[in-house]
């Protein structure tokens, strides 16, 4: 894991979520842990540290029991193949050996209901946790990059920029894999100079091309402080 101090700097980057809301990475990482694991930290690590690690070592995080399972619904546990007393399950347990989603039938039926019952609500909640965790581990949700001259002020993730755009994004997007690789080395050497330089470069790009939707420094700081207060309040 990278240090908490360095992870905090990563948490100050801005992303655009699927609804178009602009938020600090720290807000997303906090929401991720709270919604998926029902906790503000994971084994003593901050949410920002965890999110960085997920993108460095996705295969590892597929195996980690981090998805909180609701009490009383043994059907979910039976379908995904975990112990009936298990409080948490790994993402991989929700898929079979061929990559098929084990809860597909139950969630399809649950989402069709206008007023789902408690049993169906449990499946919907589990499905949302699975999708949220997958979006984090895959990097799909990390929409760091404002699209130059986009009339809708859309931002994109590294995964969404695999085809040439004939803009400076074709170069800038590579900051993401470079950063996660550099952060691995930094966590071992304790020298975060290069990793922080990449974060600074990406932050400058966001401010230069983020347009009207980019968070101001005041709003960014206020939201991060609120996240810290919310965690402290629960201690």
Write out the residue ranges for each language-model feature.
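Soluble extramembrane regions of membrane proteins in the secretory/endomembrane system
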Residues: 1-223
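Core alpha-helical transmembrane segments of integral membrane proteins
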Residues: 217-235
């Amino acid at each position: 894991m990278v240090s908490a101090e360095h992870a905090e700097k990563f948490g100050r980057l801005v992303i655009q979520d699927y609804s178009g809301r602009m938020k600090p990475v720290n807000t997303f990482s906090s929401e991720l842990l709270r919604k998926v694991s029902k906790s503000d930290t994971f084994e003593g690590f901050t949410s920002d540290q965890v999110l960085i690690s997920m993108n460095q070592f996705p295969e590892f995080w597929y195996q980690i029991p981090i998805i909180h399972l609701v009490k009383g619904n043994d059907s979910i546990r039976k379908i995904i193949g975990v112990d009936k007393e298990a409080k948490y399950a790994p993402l991989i347990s929700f898929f079979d050996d061929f990559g098929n989603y084990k809860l597909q039938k139950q969630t399809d039926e649950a989402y069709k209901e206008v007023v789902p019952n408690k049993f169906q609500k449990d499946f919907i909640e589990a499905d949302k946790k699975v999708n949220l965790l997958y979006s984090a581990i895959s990097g799909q949700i990390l929409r760091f990059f404002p699209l130059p001259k986009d009339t809708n002020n859309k931002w994109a993730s590294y995964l969404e920029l695999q085809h040439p755009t004939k803009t400076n994004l074709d170069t800038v997007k590579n900051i993401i894999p470079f950063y996660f690789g550099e952060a691995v080395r930094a966590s071992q050497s304790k020298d975060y100079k290069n990793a922080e330089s990449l974060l600074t470069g990406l932050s400058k790009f966001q401010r230069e091309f983020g347009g009207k939707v980019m968070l101001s420094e005041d709003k960014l700081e206020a939201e991060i402080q609120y996240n810290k207060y919310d965690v402290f309040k629960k201690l």
